[in-house]
C-alpha cells in the first residue's frame, strides 16, 4: 500500500474524502487543503483518472530537517532517486516555503535539483535533464519552518486541466471547483440543467461528464508518472480502457439535456468547442443571449436546476449593474421557473441578497484567494393570485411619491438636476439626485454600530428599488459613499473617467461629472441662489469667490453682468468653470478666471465690484492656504475684507453650509453692514425636508 495525499481547494476536503472512499481509498484523513489516504498502484491510477475534485495526487518520498542549505541537500540526496527515475527521464522541481536558512524558493529548488543530479553522477549514471515545461517527473518540496517534505507529483499538471479547455481563455473557476459546485447544487443527473451565464461552459461540461460517467482524466495527454520507475503500464492501460468503455456507454444511455447561454458570442463559441473536445457536445445547447432574454426551455416540464457562477464586482461603480442583474435573475426565476431549483456560486453573498429569494442550503469554498459561498434555492410554483415581492418597499413607495411630485415641478421650472430623496426614511440613509436621465445615489457612511453586512445589503436593496422606480438602465446609475463633510474631503478625487454630462438649469447649460469626484460640479441646493444672482447682475461687475466650477458666474453672465471674475484655488475647477462659461457663450476679457487662495487674494485685491457671491468652506486648513479658516469664527473678518471691494450700493450674497451658523449682527454693524437672511427664499421644493442644508444672506452697507 502507498501513502498518498490528494490536494484540493479549501472547503472541498470532506467532499473529496467521500469521492476517494468510493474509488477504494482506505485510511482517509482530512486535513486543511486535502486528504491523506492509502491505496495500491491501481488506486493511484483510479484516483488520477476519476477524481473530479482533487487538484493533485502526491506520493510522499520523505522528510528532512533543514537548519542549513547543506541539510536540505543531504536530506534530498538520502532518497534513492535512481530507483525512482526511469532512465532518461526528465524532471522539474517545485519548491515552496522559506525559513531563516532558505530565504529564496529559487535557491531552494536549485539545491534540490543539485542533490538529485549528484545522486546519479556519484553512481556514474547519466545525469537526468531538467525540463520545466513538460517534465516526466515533477518533484515537489514544501518547507515549513525547519521541516522539508519531499514528494512526487503523480499528476504532472494540475488535475483541473482536463484536456478539453482552450488554455488561451481565462476561466473564472477551475474545473475541479466547478465539479464540486455541480455536486453541491442538488442537481440530479437525468434532469435538465441550465446555466444562464455560462461563460466558456465549465459548469455544464463538468456536469455532463459526471452525468455520462466520463472520467475527468480521459482527455489528458500528459501525466506525472511517465518517468516513474514504479509505473505499471499494464494496469494503467486497464484503467484507461475501463474509463473509455464507461464513457461510451454513459453517453449512449443519457437522455436528458443541458442548456447554456451568455451575452458574449465569443465565449459561447469557445464553450461549444470545449464541449466538443470533452466528448459531450451533443448534449449541450449553447445560445447567445443575456439574462434579460432568459426563458424556461421546458415550460411544460420536467423540472430542472439553474446553476451559475454570476459575475461580481471589485469596484463600487460596477455594483448597480450587478445588483440589477441579480434582481432580474430573481424575478425571472420566480416568474418562469416555478418548481425548479437554483444554485449560485458567488464571491459576493450580498449580491445574492438582490435575488429576493430564501436559500435552503449554503456551502463555503475558496476560489483561489476569494472566500465564496454557494447558495441553493427552491423556486416555489406561482399561483394566479401570487403577488410579486417588492424590494425595499417603503423606500420604493417614498421615491415613487417624490418622483411624481418633483418631476412635474422640475419640468415646469426648466431644470434637469434635482434631489429626489434625502434620507426621508431613517433606515434608508441615502440621497438620490437626478441629472437628466442619470441618477446618483449617495450613501451616507453608516455609524460603526451598524452591522456592515446588513448596511451593505440595505444599500443593494436601495439600488435595485431605485433602478425599478426610475426605470433607468444600470449604467446610468452612479453610486457614491460619503461621510459627513470633513474639511477638504469634499474635493477628493475618486476616479479618472473624465466623462462629462451637459445639463440645463433654467437658461444655463452646465457640465457635470458624476463619477470622478465626491461632488458632481453642481451644488443643487444653491440653484435658486444662482438664479437670484442672475437676476441681480444686469450691468454689474460680479465677483465669485470659492467659485468651485463657476456655475454662479454663468448665471451672472447670462443675466447681463458687465464682467465676471471667478476665483478658486483649484486649477481643475477653474478649467471646469471656463468650460461652463464657454458652453454659454461667455468668454473673453469680460470673464476672468483667477487661480488663487481666495482669502489671500481678497486681502491684496484693490478692485471694486457691484455684486459678490461667496460660499466658503465651513472649515479649511489646506496646505495651500496661508492659514486655517472657520466660517463661524472668521466670518466678520471675511466681511471686513469683502466690504473693501464692494462698490457703493453693492451687495454681497454670503452662503455657507454650517449647521447652526449664527450671524454676528453686532460685528457687522460695527463694520457698517447689515444682513438680511434669505435662506427660506433659496430653498426649493426638492430640499424642503432639509432646512439646514445651507444658510444664505444678503449683506449691504448700512
UniProtKB/Swiss-Prot annotation:
EC number: 2.1.1.173, 2.1.1.264
UniProt KW keywords: Cytoplasm, Methyltransferase, RNA-binding, rRNA processing, S-adenosyl-L-methionine, Transferase
Gene3D superfamilies: 3.30.2130.30, RNA methyltransferase domain (HRMD) like, Vaccinia Virus protein VP39
A GO CC term assigned to this protein in UniProt: cytoplasm
Record-linked InterPro entries: 23SrRNA_methyltr_KL (IPR017244), DNA_methylase_N6_adenine_CS (IPR002052), RlmKL-like_Mtase (IPR000241), RlmKL-like_Mtase_CS (IPR053943), RlmL_1st (IPR054170), SAM-dep_methyl-trfase (IPR019614), SAM-dependent_MTases_sf (IPR029063), THUMP_dom (IPR004114)
Catalytically driven reaction(s): guanosine(2445) in 23S rRNA + S-adenosyl-L-methionine = N(2)-methylguanosine(2445) in 23S rRNA + S-adenosyl-L-homocysteine + H(+); guanosine(2069) in 23S rRNA + S-adenosyl-L-methionine = N(2)-methylguanosine(2069) in 23S rRNA + S-adenosyl-L-homocysteine + H(+)
THUMP domain ranges (all copies): 43-154
GO terms of molecular function: 23S rRNA (guanine(2445)-N(2))-methyltransferase activity; RNA binding; rRNA (guanine-N7-)-methyltransferase activity
Transmembrane segments: none
Organism domain of life: Bacteria
Keyword match Plastid: no
Subcellular location: Cytoplasm
Record-stated family: Belongs to the methyltransferase superfamily. RlmKL family.
Protein name: Ribosomal RNA large subunit methyltransferase K/L
Source species of the chain: Salmonella schwarzengrund (strain CVM19633)
Amino acid at each position: 500500500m502507498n501513502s498518498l495525499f490528494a490536494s484540493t481547494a479549501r472547503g472541498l476536503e470532506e467532499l473529496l474524502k467521500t469521492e476517494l472512499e468510493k474509488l477504494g481509498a482506505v485510511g482517509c484523513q482530512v486535513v486543511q487543503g486535502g486528504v491523506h489516504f492509502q491505496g495500491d498502484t491501481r488506486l493511484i491510477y483510479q484516483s488520477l483518472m476519476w477524481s473530479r475534485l482533487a487538484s493533485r495526487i502526491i506520493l510522499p518520498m520523505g522528510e528532512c530537517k533543514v537548519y542549513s542549505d547543506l541539510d536540505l541537500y543531504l536530506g534530498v540526496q538520502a532518497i534513492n532517486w535512481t530507483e525512482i527515475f526511469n532512465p532518461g527521464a526528465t524532471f522539474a522541481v517545485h519548491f515552496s516555503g522559506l525559513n531563516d536558512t532558505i530565504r529564496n524558493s529559487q535557491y531552494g529548488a536549485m539545491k534540490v535539483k543539485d542533490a538529485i543530479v549528484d545522486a546519479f553522477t556519484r553512481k556514474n549514471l547519466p545525469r537526468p535533464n531538467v525540463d520545466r515545461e513538460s517534465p516526466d517527473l515533477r518533484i515537489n518540496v514544501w518547507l515549513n519552518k525547519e521541516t522539508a517534505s519531499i514528494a512526487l507529483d503523480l499528476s504532472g499538471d494540475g488535475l483541473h486541466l482536463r484536456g478539453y479547455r482552450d488554455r488561451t481563455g481565462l476561466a473564472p473557476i477551475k474545473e475541479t471547483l466547478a465539479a464540486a459546485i455541480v455536486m453541491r447544487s442538488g442537481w440530479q443527473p437525468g434532469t435538465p440543467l441550465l446555466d444562464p451565464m455560462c461563460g466558456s461552459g465549465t459548469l455544464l461540461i463538468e456536469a455532463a461528464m459526471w452525468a455520462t460517467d466520463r472520467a475527468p482524466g480521459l482527455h489528458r495527454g500528459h501525466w506525472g508518472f511517465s518517468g516513474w520507475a514504479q509505473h505499471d503500464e499494464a494496469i494503467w492501460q486497464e484503467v484507461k480502457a475501463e474509463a473509455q468503455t464507461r464513457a461510451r456507454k454513459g453517453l449512449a444511455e443519457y437522455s436528458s439535456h443541458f442548456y447554456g447561454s451568455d451575452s458574449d458570442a465569443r465565449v459561447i463559441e469557445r464553450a461549444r468547442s470545449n464541449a466538443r473536445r470533452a466528448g459531450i457536445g451533443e448534449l449541450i445547447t449553447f445560445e447567445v443571449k443575456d439574462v434579460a432574454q432568459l426563458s424556461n426551455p421546458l415550460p411544460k416540464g420536467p423540472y430542472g436546476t439553474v446553476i451559475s457562477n454570476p459575475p461580481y464586482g471589485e469596484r463600487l461603480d460596477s455594483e448597480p449593474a450587478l445588483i440589477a442583474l441579480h434582481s432580474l435573475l430573481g424575478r425571472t426565476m420566480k416568474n418562469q421557473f416555478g418548481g425548479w431549483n437554483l444554485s449560485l456560486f458567488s464571491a459576493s453573498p450580498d449580491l445574492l441578497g438582490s435575488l429576493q429569494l430564501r436559500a435552503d442550503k449554503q456551502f463555503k469554498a475558496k476560489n483561489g484567494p476569494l472566500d465564496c459561498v454557494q447558495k441553493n434555492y427552491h423556486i416555489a410554483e406561482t399561483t394566479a393570485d401570487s403577488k410579486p415581492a417588492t424590494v425595499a418597499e417603503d423606500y420604493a413607495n417614498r421615491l415613487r411619491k417624490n418622483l411624481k411630485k418633483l418631476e412635474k415641478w422640475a419640468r415646469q421650472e426648466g431644470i434637469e438636476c434635482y434631489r429626489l430623496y434625502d434620507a426621508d426614511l431613517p433606515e434608508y440613509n441615502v440621497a438620490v439626485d437626478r441629472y437628466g436621465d442619470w441618477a446618483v445615489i449617495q450613501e451616507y457612511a453608516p455609524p460603526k454600530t451598524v452591522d456592515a453586512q446588513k448596511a451593505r445589503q440595505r444599500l443593494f436593496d436601495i439600488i435595485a428599488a431605485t433602478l425599478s422606480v426610475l426605470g433607468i438602465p444600470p449604467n446610468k446609475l452612479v453610486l457614491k459613499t460619503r461621510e459627513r463633510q470633513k474639511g477638504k474631503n469634499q474635493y477628493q478625487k475618486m476616479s479618472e473617467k473624465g466623462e462629462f454630462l451637459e445639463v440645463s438649469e433654467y437658461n444655463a447649460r452646465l457640465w457635470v461629472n458624476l463619477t470622478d469626484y465626491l461632488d458632481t460640479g453642481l451644488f443643487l441646493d444653491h440653484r435658486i441662489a444662482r438664479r437670484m444672482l442672475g437676476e441681480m447682475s444686469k450691468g454689474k461687475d460680479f465677483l465669485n469667490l470659492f467659485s468651485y466650477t463657476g456655475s454662479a458666474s454663468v448665471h451672472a453672465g447670462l443675466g447681463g453682468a458687465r464682467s465676471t471674475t471667478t476665483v478658486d484655488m483649484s486649477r481643475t475647477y477653474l478649467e471646469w468653470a471656463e468650460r461652463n462659461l464657454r458652453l454659454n457663450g461667455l468668454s473673453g476679457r469680460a470673464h476672468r478666471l483667477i487661480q488663487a487662495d481666495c482669502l489671500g487674494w481678497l486681502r491684496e485685491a484693490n478692485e471694486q465690484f457691484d455684486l459678490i457671491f461667496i460660499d466658503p468652506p465651513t472649515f479649511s486648513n489646506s496646505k495651500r492656504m496661508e492659514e486655517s479658516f472657520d466660517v463661524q469664527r472668521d466670518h466678520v473678518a471675511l466681511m471686513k475684507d469683502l466690504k473693501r471691494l464692494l462698490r457703493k450700493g453693492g451687495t454681497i450674497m454670503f452662503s455657507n453650509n454650517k449647521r447652526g451658523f449664527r450671524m454676528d449682527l453686532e460685528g457687522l454693524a460695527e463694520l457698517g453692514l447689515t444682513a438680511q437672511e434669505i435662506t427660506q427664499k433659496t430653498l426649493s421644493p426638492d430640499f424642503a425636508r432639509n432646512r439646514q442644508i445651507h444658510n444664505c444672506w444678503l449683506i449691504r452697507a448700512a
